[in-house]
Amino acid sequence: RVLSVKAAWINFFLVNKDIFLRTLCLIVVNFYFTSAGGKQGAMMLAVNTLLMTLFTIFSYVMDGFAYAGEALSGKYYGAGDKQGLHVTVRNLFQFGFLMAVVFMGIYMIGGTGFLHLLTDDNAVVEAARPYLPWACFIPVVGVTAFILDGVFIGLTDTKGMLFSTVMAMVLFFI
């Protein structure tokens, strides 16, 4: 019994190590992105901040899908219910992509309006306008990462999650 408890603790810390390193990769990319924007001047830093805020709003909603993925994937995987796991993952992707398309539409229709809610500086909003399409497509491009993050954590298969994040970080810097 002691060995099984010890093995469970070791697995717990290995999973958390992978999540910690994944989060560290995300922080490194965000730090670099902010630093690169700052080196281009105050205007570009302000533009990046506005556009990243749109991503942050979307990410709060998508974290709900990630949390659901963690809980439900873990539940069905732990119970050995492959059908329940399959249905859960399929539903997460269906509803996740639906929400991503909704956010993309909202950002495309009301993008500059949202930017004006975040700042009263018209020059910053105008400088952000050419980059707004990138922010509009982030939900559709990023939804898979949020859902898989939750599923990988729920399955305690965090090595694959860490590997994909490291590869994405490497590609970002290339």
Regions from the PLM with identified roles:
Residues 17, 29, 33, 69, ...:
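Hydrophobic/aromatic residues in alpha-helical transmembrane segments
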Residues 1, 126, 159, 169-174:
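Membrane-interface helix-loop junctions in multi-pass transport and translocation proteins
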Residues 4-32, 37, 57, 61, ...:
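Hydrophobic faces of transmembrane alpha-helices in multi-pass small-molecule transporters and flippases
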Residues 53-54, 133, 166-173:
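Small-residue-enriched core segments of transmembrane alpha-helices in multipass membrane transport
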Residues 25, 29, 33, 37, ...:
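Alpha-helical membrane-inserting segments
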Residues 1-16, 20, 73-138:
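Short alpha-helical transmembrane segments in multi-pass integral membrane proteins
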Residues 27-57, 75-76, 113-122:
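Helix-terminus/linker motif at the lipid-water interface of multi-pass membrane proteins
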Residues 47-109, 143-156, 160-164:
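Small-residue-rich hydrophobic transmembrane alpha-helices
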